[in-house]
């Protein structure tokens, strides 16, 4: 339920997401602290936060964000091409169009053998850090995190390769609560890049 308080929390969260590159969960919790609210205060849902992020970008970042988003999508495509054998799908802010230069890239890989993506990185002498993250069904998922230089932005960007079982691909493309595809394959990302032009 959208209340004036939840809208204010969402707006503060949006500022933290856009200006500091925080993930939504930590940004919501920090917003509560900054606003002096109790930790048990009901948080806005992700749809409300996404709406606030889009509004914040339109108001404060309209001149820079489209170019930054395009650069992140181009870098995502580079890694999707490198990891094409693992059926990569782009997800998160870079896919949904709310990313800025502070956003990381999240690629979901769907593998027959979960270790095969890690072996591919080792074979190509890519430094990465393995860790465990929460997957799209709330389960624990192995992630391979690395830094990659964006030539357009001239800075290092975090790239996270989330390793899923091949069987997970079937349910991965179900529309979200707004009817949107929650992730896109190489063809979809190429199409996004063709549809958008740098101002």
Over which residues does each language-model region extend?
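Catalytic core of pol beta-like nucleotidyltransferases
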Residues: 3-21, 28-101, 111-199
């Amino acid at each position: 339920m959208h209340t004036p308080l939840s809208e204010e929390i969402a707006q503060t969260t949006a500022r933290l997401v856009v200006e500091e590159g925080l993930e939504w969960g930590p940004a919501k919790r920090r917003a509560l602290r900054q606003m002096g609210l109790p930790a048990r205060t009901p948080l806005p849902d992700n749809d409300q936060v996404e709406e606030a992020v889009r509004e914040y970008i339109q108001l404060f970042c309209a001149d820079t964000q489209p170019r930054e988003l395009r650069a992140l999508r181009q870098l995502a495509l580079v890694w999707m091409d490198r990891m094409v054998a693992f059926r990569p799908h782009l997800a998160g802010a870079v896919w949904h169009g709310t990313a800025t230069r502070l956003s990381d890239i999240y690629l979901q890989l769907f593998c027959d053998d979960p270790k095969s993506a890690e072996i591919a990185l080792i074979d190509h002498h890519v430094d990465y850090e393995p860790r465990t993250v929460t997957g799209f069904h709330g389960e624990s998922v192995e992630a391979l995190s690395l830094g990659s230089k964006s030539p357009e932005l001239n800075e290092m960007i975090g790239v996270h390769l989330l390793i899923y079982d091949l069987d997970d691909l079937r349910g991965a493309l179900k529309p979200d609560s707004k009817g949107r595809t929650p992730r896109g394959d190489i063809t979809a990302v190429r199409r996004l890049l063709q549809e958008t032009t740098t101002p």
